[in-house]
């Protein structure tokens, strides 16, 4: 099995001012192997080469939580985190590996993806993560999930406005949504500012960076929950993406 680049330690250090411990590195390696194995039966990800996996899945997942010192501290101390549309477990599983004091809820609407993640969690003995088959629009209206989380992560689930509608209702006051995006435009800034404001949020930071191996453009948006989300949000299943705020 291809070794998942232990020589990346220096790049972790240079870019995130952090390095995985040996046991975290071993779990990253095991995660990579399990995903390659799972890909034989399920179409989980087209990213399978070790360098690409490292950069686009591991590094990218962790880069999203790295720039905010307050966020890192809260993950280290123990935060309640939800990852919406986690797919094969990104960014939630790498975050669960590095933030062992936090609880990570991994949500996806596709049962077969969640069944696969259940296997990953059990193989990696990741007891701080749990799974849920559901849609963001549904759990956003359920009292056991609405306004219950400190951090909501969302990567590659849609444009920023629906992502704001999926995540902000789930956050406690003061909580933070991290929306992982590729390219970004000024028009998107205007539309997400408007969406966030209607949902009780504010745009705290739009972080623009490139990935360390292929210089690919990335953006992460950080939305802070500053007021209660009005009861009519999130709207019914499908509406946030079909009729963005
Ligand atoms: C392109 S994949 C991204 C997976 C992962 N976040 C990543 O970055 O590799 C989008 C995932 O979001 C899930 N999804 C889409 N809309 C959703 C919703 N409203 N609620 C929950 N999951 C959703 C899909 O089932 C799919 O697994």
From Swiss-Prot:
GO MF annotations, alphabetized: rRNA (guanine-N7-)-methyltransferase activity
Which Cys pairs does UniProt list as disulfide-bonded?
none
Q: From what superkingdom does this record's organism come?
A: Bacteria
Provide the E.C. number(s) assigned to this enzyme: 2.1.1.-
Family matches, as HAMAP family: 16SrRNA_methyltr_G
Q: What does this protein's UniProt record list under function?
A: Specifically methylates the N7 position of a guanine in 16S rRNA.
Among its keywords, does the record have Cytoplasm? yes
Protein name (Swiss-Prot/TrEMBL)? Ribosomal RNA small subunit methyltransferase G
Q: Keywords for this entry?
A: Cytoplasm, Methyltransferase, rRNA processing, S-adenosyl-L-methionine, Transferase
Q: Does the keyword Methyltransferase apply?
A: yes
**Family the UniProt entry places it in:** Belongs to the methyltransferase superfamily. RNA methyltransferase RsmG family.
Q: Where in the cell is it found?
A: Cytoplasm
**Name of the top EC class for this enzyme:** transferase
List the GO cellular component terms: cytosol
Q: Which residues bind S-adenosyl-L-methionine?
A: 85, 90, 108-110, 136-137, 155
Species of provenance:
Nostoc sp. (strain PCC 7120 / SAG 25.82 / UTEX 2576)
Matching Gene3D superfamilies: Vaccinia Virus protein VP39 (3.40.50.150)
């Amino acid at each position: 099995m291809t070794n998942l680049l232990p020589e990346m330690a220096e790049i972790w250090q240079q870019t995130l001012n952090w390095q995985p411990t040996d046991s975290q590195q071993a779990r990253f390696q095991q995660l990579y192997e399990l995903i390659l194995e799972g890909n034989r039966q399920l179409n989980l990800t087209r990213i399978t080469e070790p360098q690409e996996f490292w950069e686009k899945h591991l590094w990218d997942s962790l880069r999203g939580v790295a720039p905010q010192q307050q966020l890192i501290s809260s993950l280290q101390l123990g935060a309640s985190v939800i990852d919406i549309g986690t797919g094969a477990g990104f960014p939630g599983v790498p975050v669960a590996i590095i933030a062992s004091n936090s609880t990570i809820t991994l949500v996806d609407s596709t049962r077969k993806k969640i069944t696969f993640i259940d296997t990953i969690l059990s193989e990696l003995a990741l007891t701080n993560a749990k799974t849920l088959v559901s849609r963001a629009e549904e759990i956003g209206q359920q009292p056991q999930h609405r306004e219950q989380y400190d951090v909501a992560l969302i990567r590659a689930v849609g444009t920023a406005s629906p992502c704001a509608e999926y995540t902000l209702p789930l956050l406690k006051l003061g909580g933070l949504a991290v929306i992982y995006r590729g390219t970004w435009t000024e028009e998107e800034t205007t539309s997400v500012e408007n969406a966030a404001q209607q949902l009780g949020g504010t745009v705290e930071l739009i972080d623009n960076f490139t990935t360390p191996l292929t210089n690919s453009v990335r953006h992460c948006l950080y939305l802070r929950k500053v007021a209660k989300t009005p009861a009519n949000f999130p709207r019914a299943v499908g509406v946030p993406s079909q009729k963005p705020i």
